[in-house]
UniProtKB/Swiss-Prot annotation:
CDD domains named in the record: HisA (cd04732)
Similarity annotation: Belongs to the HisA/HisF family.
Catalytic activity annotation: 1-(5-phospho-beta-D-ribosyl)-5-[(5-phospho-beta-D-ribosylamino)methylideneamino]imidazole-4-carboxamide = 5-[(5-phospho-1-deoxy-D-ribulos-1-ylimino)methylamino]-1-(5-phospho-beta-D-ribosyl)imidazole-4-carboxamide
GO biological process: L-histidine biosynthetic process; L-tryptophan biosynthetic process
Active site per UniProt: 8, 129
Gene from which the chain derives: hisA
NCBIfam families: 1-(5-phosphoribosyl)-5-[(5-phosphoribosylamino)methylideneamino]imidazole-4-carboxamide isomerase, PRK13585.1
Keyword entries, A-Z: Amino-acid biosynthesis, Cytoplasm, Histidine biosynthesis, Isomerase
Gene3D superfamilies: Aldolase class I
Protein name: 1-(5-phosphoribosyl)-5-[(5-phosphoribosylamino)methylideneamino] imidazole-4-carboxamide isomerase
Length: 239
C-alpha cells in the first residue's frame, strides 16, 4: 500500500482544514516546496497535493506553489482542486504532474473524465468526497443525491487510474479513517482505491493495508502533528 503525504494549499501556504471548513485552517508551513522536500527526504514515493482555493474557485489558484513543488521534488505527484476542463488537465500534465484528480467534474461532466482517461492513460484519478455515503462537490460545499459507490461504479470501464475516496466527516479530525466504507467501495469496483480522511496513527494505516483491498492511503494532519512518523510508517508498510 502506497502512503501519500498530503500538502493542502491555501493562499500559497501548506495548511490543514477540519471537515473541509475553510474557516478552520491551521497553517503548517508557509513554504510548501520545503514541506514537500522534507516528505521526500523521509522516503515517500508519491505526493498528494490539493489546491483548496481552486476547489472553491473552479480553476487553479495555487499554481505557483504547485509548480515549485514539482520542480523541487523527484517523486510523482497527484493534484486535485479546480481541475474542471481538458485545457487545465493538459496544462498540469505538461508541467510534470503525474496524475490529475477530477472531483466535481466527475459528477457534473463524467464524459470529460472518460475523455481525459482515454487521452492520458494512468494519469487521471477520480476524487469521490462523501458525507454519510453521498457525494459532495465544489470543495465539499454542495451535497448531491449521488451515492459514492454508484459514482465509482459508473467509471468502471473508463480507464481511470484510481479512485480517491474521502470521508469528509473524518477529514482533519484525527478520529481514524472509515476503513469499512473505503474497503466496501474498493470491493465494489476493480479500480484501485486510495483512502483519505481521518488517518491518525500507524495502526490506522496498517488497518487500511490489512483490509487487503485498499491500494493507498493519504495522510496530512497526522504527519504534521507528529502522530505518525513518516519514515517509520513507510518502513512498516513494506512488511
Amino acid at each position: 500500500m502506497i502512503l501519500y503525504p498530503a500538502i493542502d494549499l491555501k493562499d500559497g501556504q501548506a495548511v490543514r482544514l477540519v471537515h473541509g471548513d475553510m474557516d478552520r485552517t491551521t497553517v503548517f508551513n508557509d513554504d510548501p516546496a520545503a514541506q514537500a522536500r522534507s516528505f521526500v527526504a523521509a522516503g515517500c514515493t508519491w505526493l498528494h497535493l490539493v489546491d483548496l482555493n481552486g476547489a472553491f474557485a473552479g480553476e487553479p489558484v495555487n499554481a505557483a506553489p504547485v509548480e515549485a513543488i514539482l520542480k523541487a521534488c523527484p517523486v510523482p505527484a497527484q493534484l486535485g482542486g479546480g481541475i474542471r476542463d481538458m485545457a487545465t488537465i493538459e496544462r498540469w500534465l505538461n508541467k510534470g504532474l503525474a496524475r490529475v484528480i477530477l472531483g466535481t467534474v466527475a459528477v457534473e461532466n463524467p464524459d470529460l473524465v472518460r475523455e481525459a482517461a482515454r487521452a492520458f492513460p494512468d494519469q487521471v484519478a477520480v476524487g469521490i468526497d462523501a458525507r454519510n455515503g453521498f457525494v459532495a462537490t465544489k470543495g465539499w460545499a454542495e451535497e448531491t443525491d449521488v451515492q459514492a459507490t454508484d459514482l465509482a461504479k459508473s467509471f468502471e470501464d473508463a480507464g481511470v487510474a484510481a479512485i480517491i475516496y474521502t470521508d469528509i466527516l473524518r477529514d482533519g479530525a484525527m478520529g481514524g479513517p472509515n476503513t469499512q466504507a473505503t474497503a466496501d467501495l474498493a470491493r465494489a469496483v476493480s479500480i484501485p482505491v486510495i483512502a483519505s480522511g481521518g488517518v491518525s496513527s500507524l495502526d490506522d494505516l496498517l488497518a487500511l493495508r490489512d483490509s487487503g483491498v485498499i491500494s493507498g492511503a493519504i495522510s496530512g494532519r497526522a504527519l504534521y502533528d507528529g502522530a505518525i512518523d513518516l519514515a517509520q510508517a513507510l518502513e512498516a508498510l513494506k512488511t
